[in-house]
Every structure is written in C-alpha cells, then in structure tokens.
Amino acid sequence: MAPRPLVHLITDKSVMTRLAVVAQPTPHTQPEQHAPPVQWLRVKYAKRGRARFTSHRDFGRAFERALRRAGVPMAYTSGYSPHPRISYANAAPTGAASEAEYLEIGLAAVCDPDKVRDALDAALPHGLDVVEVVAASPGVLANELTGSHWRVDVPGLSAATLQAAADAFLAKEMVQVQRMTKNGMREFDTRAAVITLNVQDARLTVTLAHQTPLVRPDDVLAGMRLACPEFVPIDPPVLTRLAQGRLDPESGVITELRH
C-alpha cells in the first residue's frame, strides 16, 4: 500500500474560507490611556487607637474606598489594569500609632485641599484621621521625608533600667540586628540611624534618620536588648510616630512638611 501523504491539498472552497477566517490574527487591543493628573495633593494622616493595627495593605484598601465615597476625582494610571494615582512613603509598621503619615494623590480635576480633607476624614474609618491636605509637587515626597521622631512606651520597666539600656546602646559604634523583610532575613546596623535617644520615666523618645534599610523603633529596642541583657520589656512596647519630615542631623530637629 502506498504511504499516505503528509500534506493533503484542500480544494473545497468552503473549507478554505473557514480556514482563512480562523487564520486571521486577532487585532491587538491597546490599553486604555488616561490623562496625567492636573493636580497633586499631599495628605497627612494619623493612625490612632485600634487603627494602629491596620496593615499597610488594609489601609490602602480603606483609603481607596474613602476616595470613592468622598467623590474625589482621582486620576488613573494607563494600562490594562488602571489604578488610582496614590504615592505612599515610609508607612509606619503594623501595630504602631502615628500622628504623621504621608501620601500623595493625583487628581483628574482641580479641587480645594480643605474640602478634600473634610470629605476624606468623614469617609475614613474611626482612628484613621486626615490631619492636613495641601497642594504638592509630584515625585518628591520620599526625598523630603528624611527623619522621624518616635515615642516608645515601655510599661513594666523602671526608668533606671531604660537609662542603662539607652546608655549601653549609645556607647556602641555599631549594633547589628536581624529582621525578616519581604526579601528575607536582613541584618543591619541600628546605631547609625539613631540621632537622639532619651529616657523619661517609662518612656523613650528616639529620633531616627531614614536610611536603607529603614530602621524602625522596634529595631532600636532589639539593639538595646543586645547592648544590655537586663533590658527585657515585660509588656509589648507601644510605638507612636510623633513627627516625620526633613531631619537636621546636627540638631536632631524634624521640620514637618507643608508645601
């Protein structure tokens, strides 16, 4: 028996027509393009009470819902999955309260910052409070946030124990600690980021320079424990960011952002 041909010649015009239709390439669909923002606003907000346990991801969802409820005319990114133009910077860790968190939003229409503040504050959950909204220039927020001032309440320890731990920590040239990050376990120096560290009763106040990786107050507490083994907090410390802005490394003064 003769071998069957590998390719058969198709002469049926109807079959050829169907094959031609199937073979047509699918037209390429361009993603939707959105106009750039006509106005940028800087939002200063606080995390108070139980809202301090809100994760950064959960806050982002709550904030986007608040924008919709408040009727803020957001600008959107272009592409297949457009999202509102929101720029976050140096968010406080989950569990920390804050009086000075910042983000920026890009708008599709010019709005009165005070009206946006009032509408957003009314739309956000209790404990997430909008402190101030001002006009801003895009793309500079992270560069302007160079330091933070924190209060750390350490219940159950005497002022003498806190002072001894602070003195031992400050006497070191370098204090390496480890922390799990999204990129795995990282080891970094906490001492270089500490500009001031003071003790008042059962409370610490610490001024931190923002560096990479970002040193947090809980990292400083871990470093204090390494420097002073007697420093063992009985109850979980309560962290509160009091200020964030431009840091003068010589004086340790934080200048809050305005415009």
For each predicted feature, which ranges?
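Short, charge-patterned binding micro-sites
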Residues: R50, A75-L107, S137
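Helix N-cap motif at beta-to-alpha junctions
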Residues: A108-P113, L157-A159, Q211-P213
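Short, extreme N-terminal leader segments that mark the start of a protein/domain
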Residues: T17-R65, R69-V72
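Terminal, regulation- and interaction-focused segments at domain boundaries
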Residues: Q39-A51, I105-G106, T146-L162
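Core RNA-modification/binding signature centered on pseudouridine synthases
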Residues: V7-H8, M16-A23, A35, A171-H259
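Ordered, amphipathic secondary-structure segments that act as subunit-interaction surfaces
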Residues: E99-R151
